[in-house]
Amino acid sequence: MTDDFEDSFPDNETDAFEQAPLRLTVDLGALADNWRDMKKRSGRARTAAVVKADAYGLGIEDCGATLYHAGARDFFVATVAEGATLRSYAPEARIFVLSGIWQGQERQVFDNDLVPVLASEEQLSFWMATVAERGDHPCALHVDTGFNRLGLPLDDALFLADDVTRPASFDPVLVLSHLACADTPSSPMNRAQLESFRRVSAAFEGIESSLSASAGIFLGPDYHFDLTRPGIALYGGEAVNDVANPMRPVAKAEARIIQIREAGEGQTVSYGSSFLLKRASRLAIASVGYADGYQRSLSGSGIPLREMGHGGAYGVVNGHKVPVAGRVTMDLTIFDVTDVPANAIRAGDYIELFGPNVPVDETARAAGTIGYEMLTGLGLRYERQYLVADD
């Protein structure tokens, strides 16, 4: 009886991706192409890959392996734990840890051959004592040139460069800084930071220099130095404001339609009854909500961002653009599908939340945020599919 019962189900019900309430497709071929594009734009500089925050939410294992296979030999992560995970997928790469090192992490750093990026006097002192005891191991130095986040003060870095008393086991292989306004090419801050970093680069003669992340690469060769550090551009996001995005989309998020329902003119939709229907409508209830990173600020009405004049978000289903109706809830979002022909949509279809037809940065703008946050904020309920990159 059990065998007959199991045999009565169609084969596709065993395919987790095809039947998932939420799906995330990651195009590894597009990821590799985007890295090659950044490499070409970087000119003579080597091109690293930033894979922090689980490769911007898309999976450090698959993305890291793809980028390594594409040719990346320098990687940047945020934490020692991320670096340890990446090491298996990038066996001969240099892996820089942007948050540096804390006491107790020495073994992980040495065992996984990670390069801590030192950004404070405390980290410098601890690292010098560590290598004096354990022996030579490469490190990097982060110098603040105006961002006022992480980094050694400029004068301290210049003093360190000339400090003949520093131990021989102290072996910086890279000095880096980070631009505050690279996404706005006209900002005078870019040139000011460039001039400061040129002083740092000259002071640490013989040590590689790195200033540019994704947006900085687009500022041109003056900003490239020895190594560039693309991040968001690899994953298809916009790096520069107010210009066409040349990168290939990498991620596509989709939510399954649970139900399609009719609603009359004058009725309201979702919490707060703030979304008033001005005509008889058809509504599709999709299995995605703010628990999945589809933020409440993407709501069609009834929240402060909407009242400030931002347009609501939309999805695409079977080639048709459909706006969000009413407030996004924890697990569900309602889309107005009135203008989709009845024979072109049904329960079980998928609405593209962002992807090739709905740029992730456009969705982010509707939420009052940026593509970085949309990608890194994806929840745990997406069934993932990785499209393998061609050689």
Curated annotation (Swiss-Prot):
Pfam families: Ala_racemase_C, Ala_racemase_N. The modification N6-(pyridoxal phosphate)lysine is found at residue 52. Pathway: Amino-acid biosynthesis; D-alanine biosynthesis; D-alanine from L-alanine: step 1/1; Cell wall biogenesis; peptidoglycan biosynthesis. CDD domains: PLPDE_III_AR (cd00430). Its EC number is 5.1.1.1. GO terms for biological process: cell wall organization; D-alanine biosynthetic process; peptidoglycan biosynthetic process; regulation of cell shape. GO terms for cellular component: cytosol. Its cofactor is pyridoxal 5'-phosphate. GO terms for molecular function: alanine racemase activity; pyridoxal phosphate binding. It is an enzyme of class 5 (isomerase). The active site is at 52 (proton acceptor), 271 (proton acceptor). Belongs to the alanine racemase family. NCBIfam families: alr (TIGR00492). This is Alanine racemase, biosynthetic. It comes from Agrobacterium fabrum (strain C58 / ATCC 33970).
